[in-house]
């Protein structure tokens, strides 16, 4: 008799070895139809796996978070089969699940969007056939024989230590895979190819160039339709298009992956940094600055040279090898060591807006979201073990204040100790409990990612949610047990002995360039008044009023309002329309009447028009709105 314990503590008993699907059917046929896989002892398995011992089983249904990833993994196999059916000489490499979908790298002749309908039609046939996904385990030698005509699979197999290799079959199609998979192809209701791009085998430019084919999949066609609508909305908000139209930033081949910020973009940039500095000063941080380029010896000491060398830019100065910093942390360690510290000095909170460079393959670059040079708002907090909880709580409260200023919600994830880590069990327990207790006190729900922490300490990842409901991982709070050890950081305790400080490494904006791009898309270019690159524009109705318009502009600027004047010979209607398209919050029209009375006619983006406003009526509420960094459009 095999006894299966379900999550509600109920027990299902079977005379013979049951499969996962048998357990599901034991609940109900309707429930079984929605089951995708099962979890036993933390491992996800196919539903046709036999259960040979008493155990606890969690059945994964289409409603569970893991289900979509399993579905998309299976969809990648469907896409691969379709491509092979149409292109017999295509050689498959790898096909992982990625955010919002999946891709498969394939050695084949170049394809384009024009080929998608044919491939999608073939995929639809495979889905309609409801082909079961069948797992088999074969020897390494058998696997090499099976895939002997595919050098990429042979290389993958030779790189495996396992002597038993798992493969999956749907009909006549066979692929190398660990699984698990959905029961059959018919469970894929919404399936769509998204785009194609080039890629290199093993991400090595010296190796074969492949075709990377992206797709997405859902359990429901309505979900696919909603997702495609979201994609279209995102295209309208593309920060690259809006940034170009509004004159915020640009990219040039002479510095690939390194953005150029224009005057209007710098107005926004400076506002972001001014706000960051105001909040950090109020929270007890000091601001520091470390060099952009430092000696190889420093990077060897920090561990970056060993683990991150291929992403670093280097140079030789006076016969010594230097590296442009990919991260700010090691410089922060040197700053801490320049002075002796007592427990009375702690916590010490030091922030830096540091310019870092990381080499990215040209194919991976994507606007402001993926660049080679960017600024990171790092801060390092040095503390005693007793201060962990209160400092983490302080960081979370600071995160909430900053993100809320932009109308960004967020959720939290706690990542715990991975298999490979440094530090003792006691250190990890103390660090993890400190994070957990702070999260519990903070009171917002959080997920736990077991084993997903950094090797040097547990962390909290902060995922913001934008206006389209998309999530972005920007902020992170990490407890670092490696760098204080590597740099021999100490403080004198109450016992007059030397102790190792606990260090938090945290970012809130993350890459400021990336955060800038997120804000462009979040607001779709319609920024709140305090952040808008141009806060007001003066439009004279004819050329005779140009001098007066300039006088108005200068007075507004002298009061701290960012203002332009449009002196073109276009119609007033066209100039108003262009100002609205560029989301200028305050559109001021000047006619003879306004000149004579010394007043303004002001139009706001919510469609309201205020006539006959004196400077005394206009400037104070505008400045109050700016200084309060308000989000709403109710300015006057």
Curated annotation (Swiss-Prot):
Pfam families: HGTP_anticodon, TGS, tRNA-synt_2b, tRNA_SAD
Location of the TGS domain: 1-61
Transmembrane spans: none
Keywords: Aminoacyl-tRNA synthetase, ATP-binding, Cytoplasm, Ligase, Metal-binding, Nucleotide-binding, Protein biosynthesis, RNA-binding, tRNA-binding, Zinc
Annotated stretches, region: Catalytic: 238-528
Broad class of enzyme this protein falls into: ligase
Listed GO MF terms: ATP binding; metal ion binding; threonine-tRNA ligase activity; tRNA binding
EC number: 6.1.1.3
Domain of life of the native organism: Bacteria
NCBIfam families, per database record: thrS
Catalytic activities: tRNA(Thr) + L-threonine + ATP = L-threonyl-tRNA(Thr) + AMP + diphosphate + H(+)
Gene responsible for this protein: thrS
One GO cellular component, as annotated: cytoplasm
Function text: Catalyzes the attachment of threonine to tRNA(Thr) in a two-step reaction: L-threonine is first activated by ATP to form Thr-AMP and then transferred to the acceptor end of tRNA(Thr). Also edits incorrectly charged L-seryl-tRNA(Thr).
Location in or out of the cell: Cytoplasm
Cofactor needs: Zn(2+)
Name the UniProt record assigns to this protein: Threonine--tRNA ligase
Entry's family note: Belongs to the class-II aminoacyl-tRNA synthetase family.
Amino acids binding Zn(2+): 329, 380, 505
Species this protein is from: Desulforapulum autotrophicum (strain ATCC 43914 / DSM 3382 / VKM B-1955 / HRM2)
Record GO biological process: threonyl-tRNA aminoacylation
Cofactor note: Binds 1 zinc ion per subunit.
Complex formation: Homodimer.
Record keyword Cytoplasm present: yes
Listed SMART domains: tRNA_SAD
């Amino acid at each position: 008799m095999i006894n299966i314990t379900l999550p509600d503590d109920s027990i299902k008993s079977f005379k013979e070895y049951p499969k996962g699907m048998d357990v599901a059917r034991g609940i109900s046929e309707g429930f079984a139809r929605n089951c995708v896989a099962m979890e036993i002892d933390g491992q996800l398995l196919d539903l046709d796996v036999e259960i040979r011992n008493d155990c606890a089983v969690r059945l994964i249904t289409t409603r569970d978070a893991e289900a979509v990833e399993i579905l998309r993994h299976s969809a990648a196999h469907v896409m691969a089969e379709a491509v092979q059916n149409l292109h017999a000489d295509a050689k498959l490499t790898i096909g992982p699940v990625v955010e919002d979908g999946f891709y498969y790298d394939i050695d084949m002749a170049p394809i384009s969007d024009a080929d998608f309908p044919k491939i999608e039609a073939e995929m639809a046939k495979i889905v309609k056939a409801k082909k079961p996904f069948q797992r088999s385990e074969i020897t390494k030698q058998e696997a090499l024989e099976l895939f002997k005509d595919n050098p990429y699979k042979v290389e993958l197999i030779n790189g495996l230590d396992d002597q038993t290799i798992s493969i999956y079959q749907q009909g006549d199609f066979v692929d190398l895979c660990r699984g698990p998979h959905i029961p059959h192809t018919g469970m894929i209701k919404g399936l769509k190819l998204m785009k194609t791009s080039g890629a290199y085998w093993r991400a090595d430019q010296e190796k074969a160039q492949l075709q990377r084919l992206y797709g997405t999949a859902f359990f429901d066609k309505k979900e696919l339709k909603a997702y495609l609508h979201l994609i279209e909305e995102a295209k309208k908000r593309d920060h690259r298009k809006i940034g170009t139209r509004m004159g915020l930033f640009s990219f040039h081949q002479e510095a690939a992956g390194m953005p150029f910020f224009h005057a209007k973009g710098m107005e926004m940039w400076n506002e972001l940094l001014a706000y960051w500095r105001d909040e950090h000063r109020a929270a007890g941080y000091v601001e520091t600055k470390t060099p952009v380029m430092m000696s190889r010896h420093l990077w060897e000491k920090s561990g970056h040279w060993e683990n991150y060398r291929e992403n670093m830019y280097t140079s030789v100065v006076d016969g010594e090898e230097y590296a442009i910093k990919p991260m700010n942390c090691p410089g922060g360690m040197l700053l801490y060591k320049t002075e002796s510290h007592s427990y009375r000095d702690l916590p010490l909170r030091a922030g830096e807006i540091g310019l870092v460079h990381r080499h990215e393959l040209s194919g991976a670059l994507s606007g402001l979201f993926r660049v080679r040079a960017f600024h990171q708002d790092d801060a390092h907090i040095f503390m005693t073990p007793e201060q962990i909880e209160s400092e983490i709580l302080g960081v979370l409260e600071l995160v909430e204040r900053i993100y809320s200023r932009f109308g960004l919600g967020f959720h939290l994830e706690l990542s715990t100790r991975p298999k490979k880590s440094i530090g003792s069990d006691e250190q990890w327990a103390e660090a993890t409990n400190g994070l957990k207790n702070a999260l519990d006190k903070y009171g917002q729900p959080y997920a736990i990612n077991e084993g997903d922490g950094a090797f040097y300490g547990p962390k909290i990842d902060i995922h913001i949610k934008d206006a389209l409901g998309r999530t972005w991982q920007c902020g992170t709070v990490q407890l670092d047990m490696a760098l204080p050890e590597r740099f021999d950081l100490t403080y004198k305790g109450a016992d007059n002995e030397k102790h190792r400080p606990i260090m938090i490494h945290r970012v809130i904006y993350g890459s400021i360039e990336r955060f800038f791009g997120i804000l462009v898309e979040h607001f779709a270019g319609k920024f709140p008044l305090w952040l808008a690159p141009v806060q007001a524009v003066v439009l004279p109705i004819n050329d005779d009023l140009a001098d007066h318009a300039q006088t108005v502009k200068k007075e507004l600027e002298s009061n701290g309002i960012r203002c332009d004047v449009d002196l073109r010979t276009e119609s007033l209607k066209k100039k108003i329309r262009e100002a609205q398209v560029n989301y200028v919050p305050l559109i001021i029209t000047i006619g003879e009447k306004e000149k004579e009375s010394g007043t303004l006619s002001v139009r706001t983006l919510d469609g309201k028009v205020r006539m006959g406003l004196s400077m005394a009526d206009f400037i104070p509420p505008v400045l109050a709105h700016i200084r309060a960094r308000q989000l709403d459009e109710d300015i006057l």
